[in-house]
Each structure stands twice: as structure tokens, then as C-alpha cells.
């Protein structure tokens, strides 16, 4: 996942785009690998990042939510709600599928049978490519993206990434 996050950092460096990281390793890795973007970390809030992103997108912000497969099913209500606003928001949900719940010990998620892409599509998201597996394809997929989009990135598991300092979690505000 880190190489994809570094790509996002380089592509959206100092741009007016809000990145929301779901709880766990997605947010940890965003903190470590995306220092030049406007990030908000949903520490301790599994399943709320997409809804927060939708609220910010409805207020006129360009939003990219970065999340993992372990929490994807917790966004079901948010997915269908976002789909109702497909023509009114600039919101991209990037699902990083590593088939693990890394932050709680690396348990397998066993969710591939759910069909993430079909769930997103049936909720009203436009799916950009079916599955992205390389940074090169990711760069072209994310370039000039707008509207309500869903991107599924199949990735591996990175080494342990340190937690952000507590003061970052407590004082993080939108810029």
C-alpha cells in the first residue's frame, strides 16, 4: 500500500484535496507516506470515514477516502447514501485490499466473496478499472478523477508502520 500512497502524495502535493484515512494501518501509512497532502485520520472510528468524506464532499470539497478491506463492510450504509448524491459530489473511495486486518494482528478478512466492486457499483459509484495492481496503472487511474468514483487496489502487506503521535490524532483539523 505504501507505494500507492507515495504516488498519491506526489500527485496531489499541496493541492486542495482532502484525504480521509480510515482507522488502522491505512491512516498510519497515510501519516508516514503522505506528508504533503491535507489528511484527516479517523483514529478509533472503524466505518465512519466514508460518511465523513461524503459530508465534506457535499460541502464542496474534493475528497479521497483511503480505506482497507477489513472495514469495507462497515461502510455499507455510507456507500448507498453516497450513491444518492453521485451527480453532486466529488468523492473517490480507494479500497486497499490486502486481504488482512493488519492493525489487529494480521487476520485474514475472508471477504473476497462479497465482491467489493459489485457492491460499490450497485451503490451508485462509478468503478474506475476493475482492480488496480500496479502503481503505473494507479497513476493513470487517479489522474484528473472527479465525481463519485470507486477504485479497488490489490496490494500486499507492508512492514509495521508506526502509529502517528497522539498530538496529531488529537489536534488534526481540516486546513
Indicate residue ranges for each PLM-predicted region.
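Generic beta-sheet signal
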Residues: 17-19, 63-65, 91, 145-155
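Active-site diphosphate/adenylate-binding microenvironment
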Residues: 1-46
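Thiamine diphosphate
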Residues: 28-98
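Glycine-rich beta-alpha junction loops
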Residues: 23-26, 98-100, 154-159
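Long, charge-dense
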Residues: 96-106
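Conserved thiamine diphosphate
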Residues: 107-141
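General beta-strand structural signal in soluble alpha/beta enzymes
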Residues: 18-23, 41-42, 65, 129-132, ...
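Glycine/aspartate-rich loop-and-adjacent alpha/beta segment that forms the canonical ThDP
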Residues: 1-3, 33-36, 144-175
Amino acid at each position: 500500500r505504501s507505494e500507492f500512497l507515495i504516488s498519491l502524495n506526489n500527485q496531489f502535493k499541496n493541492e486542495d484535496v482532502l484525504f480521509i484515512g480510515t482507522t488502522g494501518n491505512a491512516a498510519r501509512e497515510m501519516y508516514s507516506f503522505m506528508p504533503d497532502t491535507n489528511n484527516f485520520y479517523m483514529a478509533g472510528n472503524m466505518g465512519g470515514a466514508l460518511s465523513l468524506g461524503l459530508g465534506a464532499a457535499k460541502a464542496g470539497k474534493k475528497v479521497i477516502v483511503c480505506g482497507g478491506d477489513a472495514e469495507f463492510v462497515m461502510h455499507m450504509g455510507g456507500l448507498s447514501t453516497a450513491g444518492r448524491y453521485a451527480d453532486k459530489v466529488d468523492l473517490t473511495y480507494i479500497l486497499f485490499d490486502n486481504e488482512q486486518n493488519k492493525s489487529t494482528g494480521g487476520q485474514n478478512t475472508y471477504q473476497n466473496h462479497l465482491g467489493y466492486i459489485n457492491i460499490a457499483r450497485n451503490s451508485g459509484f462509478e468503478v474506475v478499472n476493475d482492480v488496480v495492481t500496479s502503481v503505473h496503472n494507479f497513476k493513470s487511474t487517479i489522474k484528473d478523477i472527479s465525481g463519485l468514483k470507486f477504485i479497488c487496489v490489490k496490494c500486499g502487506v507492508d512492514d509495521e508502520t508506526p502509529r502517528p503521535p497522539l498530538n496529531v490524532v488529537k489536534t488534526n483539523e481540516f486546513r
